[in-house]
Amino acid sequence: MVKHLDHESVLNILPDRDVNANKGDFGRILLLCGSRGFTGAAALAAMGALRTGAGLVYLGVPESIYAIEAIKLDEPVVFPLADEGGMLSDRSIGDIKGRLSTMDAVLVGPGIGRSPGTRAVVTAVLESYQGPVVLDADGINVLSGHRDVLRGRKYPTILTPHDKEFRRIGGDLSVDRIQAAESFAREMGVVLLLKGHETIITNGQQTYVNGTGNPGMAVGGCGDVLSGMIVSLLGQGIEPLEAAAAAAWLHGKAGDVCAQELGQYGMLPTDMLRALPRLLK
């Protein structure tokens, strides 16, 4: 059964906020993002998480870009990890594992690049972390030819590929897109958010089709914001399918607000970040 979301249904998905709550009640989120030359991806993902209500955002980045991210960002807790060639190294895995048990959700992928080290990091998180994981961008790409690590995972996993990334991990788009997404999600035991015009979000049993968004969002960094939003909602206790669907709707609607106010040619992901609070009021 295919469902569509609207603003009211999305707001109903979001948890109520207790007057006595503290920052720890709204999710401790770990992001493993960025590499040399792709510092913006990490920053945008972190701010996407914060703008969607995460209480605490921890951002682990390669040591070589740590100073850049620390200057860029005020609210997230940024920390350096061992790197090789400007990308996360397998030597960072011990440090990462030491942090996982205190986290409510983890995002891996925006801007991390493709290397043996980043593949080792993605695999280690999937195998070690007993909680929900979001994989985006190169967090997906490094699993090309190694996707069995997804099938055996006992905890929620959300993948957010565009068409090319979907094909790299074995997705078959020769058939109907909804059918292809549902089949992949069932086979791999994941929630799949297949980006595109009318983004599809499915766990293989229940499916949402998102109607918000516009061509002005076809710009680098837009997907990084979305992945940060998804992991934020996961960390706040929302079920994986609903977290992905709500984030997709809000992300697209923020893009629509920016297109109306600024035009599709000049709007940026940072403009979408500024639009999000109005949609969550």
Where do the PLM segments sit?
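Small-residue (G/A/S/T)-rich helix-start motifs and N-terminal tracts that mark the onset
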Residues: 1-132, 141-158, 163-281
